[in-house]
């Protein structure tokens, strides 16, 4: 019976975090808080290019998985709540195949080098924009 209980606990912990890259990992940052602004440009060949304007945040791809520094890391790009890739610079291309709804939501959130979401005033720092097809 003890083993069954252990397996059930492991199963529910796994299923509860199956859609999370790193479940429950957030870190509160101090002021001035990082800010994100998104510009979107239709690509002449396929999809869209987004420009991620950052304030009080530095992209540091060379530091991934090292000791985190406040307000440094990367941006995680989502389309319709599905994470599609990391951005280590201000430009990111999203192919047309990700835009399968009439109204599509692009969300950009920032993470530190240990993959923790950055939080200001108990809210994950992110920005969203709607793309209509």
Enumerate the predicted regions with their spans.
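Short beta-strand segments within Ig-like beta-sandwich modules, predominantly Fibronectin type-III
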Residues: 83-89
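Contiguous beta-strand segments within globular domains
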Residues: 41-56
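Short, compositionally biased P/S/T/A/G/V-rich stretches that sit at domain boundaries
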Residues: 20-43
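Short strand-turn-strand beta-turns centered on an Asx-Gly dipeptide
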Residues: 77-81
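Exposed aromatic-hydrophobic patches
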Residues: 91-98
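Short, well-structured beta-strand segments within conserved domains
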Residues: 48-52, 99-112
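Short amphipathic, basic-aromatic surface patches that mediate peripheral association
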Residues: 53-67
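Short acidic/polar inter-strand loop motif in beta-rich domains
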Residues: 85, 111-119
């Amino acid at each position: 019976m003890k083993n069954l209980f252990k397996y059930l606990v492991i199963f529910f912990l796994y299923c509860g975090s199956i859609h999370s890259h790193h479940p429950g990992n957030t870190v509160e940052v101090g002021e001035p808080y990082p800010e994100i602004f998104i510009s979107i440009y239709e690509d002449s060949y396929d999809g869209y290019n987004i420009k991620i304007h950052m304030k009080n945040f530095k992209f540091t791809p060379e530091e991934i998985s090292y000791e985190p520094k406040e307000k440094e890391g990367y941006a995680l790009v989502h389309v319709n709540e599905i994470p599609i890739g990391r951005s280590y610079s201000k430009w990111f291309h999203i192919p047309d195949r990700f835009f399968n709804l009439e109204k599509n939501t692009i969300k950009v959130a920032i993470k530190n080098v240990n993959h923790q979401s950055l939080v200001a005033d108990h809210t994950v720092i992110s920005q969203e924009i709607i793309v209509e097809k």
